[in-house]
């Protein structure tokens, strides 16, 4: 009798272990699908322009500076690849030199929201923080590739929070050039490197 109850316990244990393994496998599958959804952004390209895949790893770049644009309710984190950060630390463009080819800027934009219900913040003294991701924009310096736009190529990718996907905004690598003409004296870069 004892051996029969032992067999039942072994069978029950094996059965429960199998269920646990299936649950883990399903969880891993969901994680892989989540990663694939995130990685899908690297297949997006501005027609006749920059591809998101050209900027792999931008999420880990150092911060150039942050900015807030109240008129359009956006918070921005401006990031730079190592070449951009090193050039900025050397004083470019303030020293009159242009950024070197290979410099890349990523601008991550979020809608902003006010925190008013967590101490020490209140309606009278709110904290402004990122809310929904709005877009990711890029500028890349390559004089040979972009001679008609002062050496800079531009790309903007709008984020759809509902579907979790990006889509290109505009066409061609010159889509941001007209706007950046206002920053010509700073090699067409609006946001200066913030000293630390």
Where do the protein language model's features map onto the residues?
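Sequence context surrounding c-type heme c attachment/ligation sites in exported
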Residues: 28-30, 34-36, 44-66, 96-196
């Amino acid at each position: 009798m004892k051996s029969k109850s032992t067999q039942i316990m072994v069978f029950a244990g094996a059965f429960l272990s199998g269920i646990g393994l299936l649950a883990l496998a399903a969880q891993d599958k969901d994680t892989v699908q989540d990663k694939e959804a995130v990685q899908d952004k690297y297949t997006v390209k501005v027609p006749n322009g920059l591809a998101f895949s050209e900027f792999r790893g931008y999420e880990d770049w150092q911060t150039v500076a942050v900015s807030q644009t109240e008129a359009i309710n956006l918070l921005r984190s401006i990031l730079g690849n190592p070449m951009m950060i090193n050039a900025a630390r050397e004083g470019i463009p303030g020293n009159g030199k242009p950024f070197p080819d290979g410099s890349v800027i990523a601008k991550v934009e979020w809608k902003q929201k006010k925190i008013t219900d967590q101490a020490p913040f209140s309606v009278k003294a709110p904290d402004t923080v990122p809310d929904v991701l709005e877009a990711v924009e890029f500028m890349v310096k390559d004089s040979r590739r972009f001679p008609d736009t002062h050496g800079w190529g531009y790309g903007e990718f709008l984020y759809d929070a509902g579907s979790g996907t990006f889509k290109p905004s505009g066409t061609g690598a010159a889509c941001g050039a007209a706007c950046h003409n206002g920053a010509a004296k700073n090699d067409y870069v609006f946001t200066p490197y913030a000293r630390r």
